[in-house]
């Protein structure tokens, strides 16, 4: 599973449908590289390259904006189901302590807004994924549908129709994740498995809408904005490279209230996204979705 979202995974037998990419100097932004940069860690100002980490990740002033962070809730769900050393969580998420252990220095003066101390490893571009001739070129294909998604969709259908084969399909995913099998699986089992297996793959929102869970799960989403704070401990030597890479830190998370109207969940509006205004102007037959 470590090859997913990397060039090594291009054409994988687990990619049922994928968005392919190729080197095209005339369309670097359009082919998706820009979005990889937006979702990259804040390399360049938040993190500092070490002697080993620089051979795996791209560090420069414009290589990452640190969008798209895993939440504390997601990390804790992984740990509760498979432990801190679970196959999936250790492949797809890093804690701050683990980031420090990756031979990456920390710029403690940089704020990490929108972060609770957990960092996405899934879909994090490596040097092998980058087209080195241009800073945002990315040649790793994006899986639109993975085989695990298909198995879990089949399991969900079986649960809804009281078909005992639901166990078979769900356990195929759990077996690959190095977890014990379950029997007589329920919708709660299915919901958890989809959350963990397909985390950060842009299917969670649609799942919550389909299940009718969005008004509860997303009721307070975005109302409090996290800021991950890092303070070097006394005695650190931050004047040398060795000192930076071996520094120790105290960490905390603060939250600020977000009073924007769009924060949280508004019934009969948030189930759908708005049509872009220019699309409505071009086509008067389009009626804007409710609430916008």
Language model features by range: what are they?
Residues 1-8, 72-77:
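Short alpha-helical segments and helix-capping/turn motifs at coil-helix boundaries
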Residues 3-49, 53, 137, 182-292:
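Long, intrinsically disordered, low-complexity segments
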Residues 14, 69-146, 291-292:
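Flexible, polar/acidic helix-loop-strand segments at domain edges
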Residues 17, 83-91, 141-173, 187-199, ...:
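Extended, hydrophobic/aromatic-rich amphipathic alpha-helical segments that build helical scaffolds
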Residues 45, 51-55, 164-171:
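Short, compositionally biased low-complexity segments
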Residues 46, 52, 56, 66-69, ...:
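Noncatalytic, helix-rich "gating/capping" subdomain that lines the substrate-entry/channel surface
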Residues 62-64:
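Glycine/tryptophan-enriched, flexible segments
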């Amino acid at each position: 599973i470590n090859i997913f979202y990397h060039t090594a995974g291009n054409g994988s037998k687990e990619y049922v449908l994928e968005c392919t990419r190729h080197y095209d100097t005339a369309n670097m932004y359009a082919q998706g590289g820009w979005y990889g940069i937006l979702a990259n860690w804040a390399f360049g100002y938040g993190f500092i390259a070490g002697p080993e980490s620089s051979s795996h990740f791209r560090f420069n002033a414009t290589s990452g904006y640190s969008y798209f962070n895993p939440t504390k809730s997601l990390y804790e769900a992984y740990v509760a189901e498979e432990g801190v050393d679970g196959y999936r969580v250790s492949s797809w998420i890093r804690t701050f302590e683990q980031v420090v252990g990756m031979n990456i220095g920390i710029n403690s003066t940089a704020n990490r807004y929108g972060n609770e101390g957990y960092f996405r490893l899934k879909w994090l571009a490596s040097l092998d994924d980058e087209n080195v001739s241009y800073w945002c070129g990315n040649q790793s294909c994006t899986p639109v549908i993975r085989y695990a998604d298909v198995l879990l969709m089949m399991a969900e259908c079986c649960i809804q129709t009281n078909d005992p084969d639901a166990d078979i399909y769900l356990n195929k995913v759990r077996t690959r994740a190095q977890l014990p099998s379950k029997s007589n699986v329920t919708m709660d089992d299915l919901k958890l498995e989809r959350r963990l297996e397909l985390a950060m793959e842009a299917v969670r929102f649609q799942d919550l809408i389909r299940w009718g869970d969005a008004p509860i799960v997303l009721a307070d989403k975005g109302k409090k904005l996290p800021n991950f704070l890092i303070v070097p401990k006394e005695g650190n030597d931050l004047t040398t490279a060795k000192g930076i890479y071996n520094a120790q830190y105290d960490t905390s998370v603060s939250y600020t209230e977000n009073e924007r109207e769009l924060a949280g969940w508004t019934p009969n509006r948030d189930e759908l996204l708005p049509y872009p205004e220019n699309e409505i102007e071009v086509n008067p037959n389009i009626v804007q979705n409710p609430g916008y």
